[in-house]
């Protein structure tokens, strides 16, 4: 399965998304139109929005349905 997020509105200081594995940490600072797709078992979290505006994003999950 895959997960993803599409950022629609990202005011200043709206918070980043962090991905972690056993050996690595990656922080991505979003911008409008950014689409991130990642494996569903990848540890992730969204850092707090410390800005004045609203961060608007759409998160989604894809999985294969077996017949």
What are these regions (language model features)?
Residues 1-48, 53-57, 63-67:
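Catalytic core of non-heme Fe(II) oxygenases with the double-stranded beta-helix
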